[in-house]
């Protein structure tokens, strides 16, 4: 019908009345909770400075705790607790201007004193911070005022802004630091509401955060699901809304062909490797380690462990990282060569070794593939499946193993080869000298050349079997927004997530 001024006015009033009635109800019904899943539960706690497991930072980094800088999915570094920073030409002096108006969950005001405390704590004698070497390079910390902190380094470090955005560089509050594992107190947008051991962690939005109004999710439940089939089932049933780093490669088609879901694939800086205990005989013999290398078909492992979602690597470095070189030809798949190397090393088959595998699917599935390949050259790998806490204490802590499979997700962890007490037991004076040169070099071209030399050295010495760089796979409901595509580090930035229309 035609609308007269009166009917238009009445229609406008009716519409206004309808909006007045429906608007609040619609706002109240807008989803502000989410269930996210991870493969592993954090151990031993939620303090990423107190344990090596990447699952710790996946729960707490950028959520409970914050850092001076923040690393995005595109690897771009921005300020978080630091508003800005400057650096001297020799990269030895970093001056950070801190963000004002920041408070910890316990009400304490954040200042430069907390940065000084946190970084000195990281390098203290009793510290177990896995990036202790980063902080040991700090010669002096100056705090000229509450909003300024100056880091004076022993050696120039071009990677420092990135390193200060990782979980090992969280800023903590002195009174609560000792109990951060179970009662974490940070400056982040979320607080720990509950931890149901063996099942889930619940985080709730902290209204005292400076950007609380921009945080869309009021509560996030993080479930722990290590079994690949159970991961798929939880997504299909709707029990889980988003699963970053999911082990669902074989089942991706059913998600890709379902409009209820989104599948996001991207790059990662992770390295999945077969670790060999270099301190144990006969693995202390490079010929035996090279034989194990030669016995393994990387592509078959990628198919069996990662459902084809990975790129072969020949050293402890992921494609796309600065200075990366392709070294997959250094220790190629060659079973005849593997047998010959074992013979040269005086090994009479069968050589029996234990392979302790954590509960993640890539390790369990990859272990079966590798054990079958090793058997063809006279090596019997006896598989022992262990839980994650057992792996952390027995394999990583006590070094009680011959072989194991794990994915190292930290992007800047090559320096672990210079740690003689690290769990793979590698010691090399030549590598240590080379790594000192890498750390002291600030020119990108020269640094990349030295990084290439470092990659070649650990490849030729076959410290571990470098298998593949895994593809990052996220499966989520179609309405979840803000998920990362690429994974330059293991983190779940919950403040960026929301529900779309």
Where are these regions (language model features)?
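Surface-exposed binding/hinge segments that line
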Residues: 29, 97, 131-174, 194
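Gly/Pro-rich hinge or "lid" segments in bacterial periplasmic/extracellular proteins
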Residues: 76, 162-221, 227-229, 335-336, ...
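A bilobed periplasmic-binding-protein/Venus flytrap-type ligand-binding module shared by bacterial periplasmic
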Residues: 204-208, 266-291, 418-421, 436-439, ...
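Aromatic- and charge-enriched surface segment that lines or borders ligand/interaction sites
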Residues: 83-128, 144, 150, 234, ...
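Detector for C-terminal structural segments
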Residues: 29-32, 196, 295-323, 362-371, ...
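Ligand-site clamp/hinge motif
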Residues: 178, 208-253, 371, 380-382
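N-terminal lobe/hinge region of extracytoplasmic solute-binding protein
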Residues: 37-89, 120, 185-186
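Append "and occasionally in soluble cytosolic enzymes with long acidic Gly/Pro-rich linkers
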Residues: 202-205, 257, 283-372, 453, ...
